Swiss-Prot record:
Family per similarity comment: Belongs to the FGGY kinase family.
Catalytic activity: glycerol + ATP = sn-glycerol 3-phosphate + ADP + H(+)
Pathway annotation from the record: Polyol metabolism; glycerol degradation via glycerol kinase pathway; sn-glycerol 3-phosphate from glycerol: step 1/1
CDD domains xref list: ASKHA_NBD_FGGY_GK
Name of the protein described by the UniProt record: Glycerol kinase
Activity control: Inhibited by fructose 1,6-bisphosphate (FBP).
GO molecular function per UniProt: ATP binding; glycerol kinase activity
Gene that this polypeptide is encoded by: glpK
Residues bound to ADP: 12, 16, 266, 310, 411, 415
Protein species of origin: Chloroflexus aurantiacus (strain ATCC 29366 / DSM 635 / J-10-fl)
Annotated binding of ATP, by residue: 12-14, 266, 310, 314, 411
Classification lineage: Bacteria, Bacillati, Chloroflexota, Chloroflexia, Chloroflexales
Binding residue positions for sn-glycerol 3-phosphate: 12, 82-83, 134, 244
Enzyme Commission number(s) of this protein: 2.7.1.30
Enzyme class: transferase
GO cellular component: cytosol
Amino acid sequence: MAKYAAAIDQGTTSTRCMIFDHSGNVICYDQKEHEQIYPRPGWVEHSPDEIWERTQSVIRGALSKGGLSASDIVAVGITNQRETTVVWNRKTGRPVYNAIVWQDTRTDQICNELAADGGQDRFRPKVGLPLATYFSGPKIRWILDNVPGAREAAEAGDVVFGNIDTFLTWWLTGGPNGGVHVTDVTNASRTMLMNLETLDWDDEILGIMGIPRQMLPKIVPSSMVYGTATGELAGVPVAGILGDQQAAMVGQTCFDVGEAKNTYGTGSFMLLNTGTKLVPSKSGLLTTVCYKFGDQPAVYALEGSIAITGALVQWLRDNLGLITSSAEVEALANLVEDNGGIYFVPAFSGLFAPYWRSDARGVIVGLTRYVNKDHLARAVLEATAYQTREVLDAMEQDSGVKLTALKVDGGMVYNNTLMQFQADILGVPVIRPKVAETTSLGAAYAAGLAVGFWSNTDEMRANWGVDHTWTPQMDEATRERLYRGWKKAVTRTFDWVE
């Protein structure tokens, strides 16, 4: 009797397969990193073939570590780095180009040309997103314009588009031999091509962007049986798809209007459940789909996306060599009482929410001879907390709801120094759940819900529990003084790229 739900979590830097029991506990998992390809400044790519190879490898690894086989798994769900764009040949499965990653800024010129008529918010009323290099539509357009033969093949129906969820679902369900070509509403809502009200591709925007409709996947709910897996998971229903941040919302059981979570990964992403109501943002946030379970109405969210948070710690490690492991940043930061007067604004890929400035680049301000590497480490951690505060302020403005606490997840939530500073700078408690692997858990929940392994959201909510709460310990005057300094530092990043 199958008694576990599996999740494939394909992230920006690594791929994991996690297997959960009915109580939401991790039974076993396997994880493998993949190569980050930087062909030019501002360009970021992944090899789709390597990602599929890693996916098969971690499925094998997780089953082996748990002493399990496909017959023990009720269903598998997929969660993924969103926006990252793959175009491949449907007959062979071969990509026509590397995956263009969400952080990649090569489509800046395409976005500027599209914004010349109607501005950055030209499509926002329909899609909830500003024109930005972050989203998939302009990336597809770049591939069609720059890869010889790609446009003709797309028009002929020979090459197809998908975000990573679509690419993996297609391969999992057979690839060239009958693979299912679908994407869920959460991933589709990040392409800039899906109408948020109809939950279908928008023909007017497709025409303006020059993207043939026949290359796009079918849009489906986040929880339903899409097909049956082949290979390592042969016979297991593929039954859940959620973009990584939406999956974390489901894993955190943020099913009520007004519930919010922040995930700290390569970047950071805060989402606020707005229910079945679309809330347009006037403060630089995104309106996005939170989830859609089966035939139930879609639930929407406001999202604040921050491009660089955890990646800044990696940069300290890999580019500067100031630390040898990410965990060391906390020890360094704790050697000093404050940031020594410096702020580090990591606009490596421009600034995302709430600014949407692709012309911004990273700055360190306030340097004096007094500053040492410990202060730099502290400023790196603080940058994550300040950026989160900016997003929270925007959310409260847009929604009219005052957040009373923030649920957190992701790798950085084990950094106590950061989490305490986060509570201090927000002025609200920060809560880490018992199962911090909420992204994978959310995908497992979506898949398990589709096959009746979990009967409703109440069953999932019963699994959620508090591991640790950080309460604010900073006085209001200090909080606002520090935050003013940050806001000033941010202005120094603008107008850098011509």
